[in-house]
């Protein structure tokens, strides 16, 4: 009985060391992303990209509908890229500090929902910024691109939630 108890204790301490290592890793990545985000803000220039709304107006003279783009906002691009990094920093700091106990509890179940929430925000922001680089400046398109990408990431969370107690991985979340 002593050997079983000793094996359990050594595997528990190995698991605890692994979680402590992940905590330290998240702290390190949090600081790295924070420094990168601050650096990005410091070195970014005043480049902006426009965001427009595009509605149709009826032209009485020509009896036709004509686009009527209206500038809504000038997005400071460097700051927006820095936000991508700062979102990651916040997520890493959360996991290493106030969210650590929940993080460990979820990892033991084979889940990491914070990852998908962070991805839903940060990767959606980055996809929107890439779209803006190639001329997607319509507010409606930007909102939809963000929403579709965020939804795809949240399906990853749904997949982990559904598969935490299954023998075989169910990929249904990604079929939709």
Model-flagged regions — what are they?
Residues 1-7:
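N-terminal acidic, proline/glycine-rich, low-complexity intrinsically disordered segments
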Residues 123-176:
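Membrane-proximal helix-loop-helix units in multi-pass membrane proteins
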């Amino acid at each position: 009985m002593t050997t079983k108890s000793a094996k359990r204790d050594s595997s528990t301490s190995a698991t605890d060391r692994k979680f402590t290592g992940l905590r330290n890793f998240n702290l390190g990545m949090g600081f790295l992303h924070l420094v990168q985000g601050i650096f990005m803000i410091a070195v970014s220039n005043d480049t902006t990209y426009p965001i427009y709304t595009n509605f149709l107006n009826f032209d009485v003279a020509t009896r036709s509908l004509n686009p009527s783009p209206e500038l809504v906002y000038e997005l400071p691009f460097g700051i927006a890229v820095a936000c991508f990094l700062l979102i990651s920093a916040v997520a890493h700091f959360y996991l290493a500090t106030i969210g650590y106990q929940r993080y460990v509890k979820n990892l033991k179940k084979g889940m990491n929902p914070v990852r998908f929430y962070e991805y839903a925000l940060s990767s959606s922001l980055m996809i929107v910024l890439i779209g803006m680089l190639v001329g997607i400046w319509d507010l409606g398109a930007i909102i939809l691109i963000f929403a579709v990408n965020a939804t795809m990431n949240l399906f990853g969370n749904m997949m982990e939630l559904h598969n935490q107690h299954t023998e075989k991985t169910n990929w249904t979340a990604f079929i939709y």
